[in-house]
Amino acid sequence: MYLCPSFIKKLIMDVPFIYGRLAERESFIDRVEDRKELKNFLRHGINVILVSPRRWGKSSLVRTSMEELMQEDQQTKVCFLDASKIHTEEEFYNKFASTVIQGVSSTLEQKLSDLVKFINRFTPSITIASDPMNSIKVNLKVNPIKESPENILQLPERIAEAKGIKIIVCIDEFQQLANLPTWKNLEAMLRAEWQLQHHTTYCLYGSKTHMMKDIFNKASSPFFKFGQLMNLKRIAKEYWIPYIVNNFEHTGKSISESQAECLCERVKYNSWYVQQYSFFLWSHTEKKVTQALLDQQLQLVLDTNEDLFLTEIDELTPTQIGMLKAIASGEKHFNAKDIVEKYGLGQPQSITRNKKVLVEKDLVEKHIQDFSFVDPVFELWLKREYNILPIGIENRTKSVVNETMSNYKK
C-alpha cells in the first residue's frame, strides 16, 4: 500500500503529541529564555557546552534556536553533527568534513566546488544521496598517523574566512568521542585547533552528564573553560499544562488542568515522557480523560520502556541493584547496619564504589545529602518491579508520585 508524502505529513501533524523525533514548531514548548541565551552566546562567538539528562529536549532546543538564528542572520551557517555512532577517529574526521560541507553549501554544485577547493590535501571518495537536500557523504580515508587531521579541523574556519560568513558547528552526544581509543590525543588537538578559530563557534552537547562534566569541568582537561556552560532545566508546568489541555481540546477531547498537572508530576516534567504519556492518554481517550485512564496509561509508559530498563539492570551487580532499591526507598544512610542487611549492599568499599558506578552510568545523581534518579520513569518502574511500596499499583500511584517528587520540588 502506497502512502503519499503529503498524506503522511498530514497524519503526523494531526497527532498532537510528538516524541522520538525532534520537536518542531507547534510541538516545541517554551524554552524562550534558553533559546535567547543560546543564540546570544553563539552569535557573539562564545562556545557553548549544553548539559542535561537524556530526553530533556537538548537536540530540539539547539535545532530550533539555530534555525531562528539563521533566519535572523543570513551570514550565519550552522552545521549539525551527531557523534552518537562514531567509533573511530577516522569516522569523526569524515563526519566532521561532511557536516561542514553540507551545512555551508546550499546546492550540490556548491558542495562539490567546496570539496575541491577546501579539501585539496586529501583524495576523498564522495557519495551523493538521492534526496531533496542533495546530501553528500565524504570519505577522506584519513590516516591520523600519516596525514595531518588538523587540516580537517580547520575546515570550517577556512571556509568561513573565504566566504565572509560565520559558521556554528553543533555536535550532539559529544561525550561519545571520549570513548574513542585515541581520545586523549584527539581531545588536546580539538582544543588546540578550535580555540584559534575566530569565525567558527562550537555548540557541544550531550546526555551523559557525568562524562560531559568530566570533559569540561575538570581543571586538568584540555576543554576546561572552553566556553559557556548551560545546564538545561525542566520545562515548567505553566507551559506544559496549557499545551496538553489545548491539544486535547483541538482534537475534540478533554483533560482537566489538574489531570494534566498530575501527568506532568508523575514523570517529573521530563519532556520525552510528558509527550509519550500524553500521547498514550490521548490515543486511548474517546472524549474525556478519567482517573482510571490516567493510571492505566502510566502503566503503559512503564511497560513500553521496560526493555530498556531491563537492559540497564542486567548490566548491574546485585549490590548495585540493592543500592538502587535503597535509593528508591528513600534511604540515605547506606552504611548503617540495618540498611546494609536489608538491601544487601555489601562491604563498605563496595558501597563507596557502587555509588560512583551508578553516578557514572547516569542512573542516579548525587546531591549534598542524598541521591535521586536521573530517569523518573525508571524509578517508577523499579518500584513496581521490586514491589518497594507494598500496595496495589493502581492505588499506589499517588504515593509513588508524592514520594518520587519530594526530592525535586523546590
Question: What residue ranges belong to the model's regions?
Answer:
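Alpha-helical DNA-recognition elements
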Residues: 68, 280, 357
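P-loop NTPase nucleotide-binding core
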Residues: 53-56, 60-168, 200
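Alpha-helical sensor/transducer elements of the RecA-like P-loop NTPase core
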Residues: 60, 198-249
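C-terminal leucine-rich, beta-strand-based interaction scaffolds used for sensing/assembly
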Residues: 2, 6-17, 161, 303, ...
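Sensor-1/coupling segment of RecA-like P-loop NTPase cores
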Residues: 161-163, 167-170, 176-182, 189-220
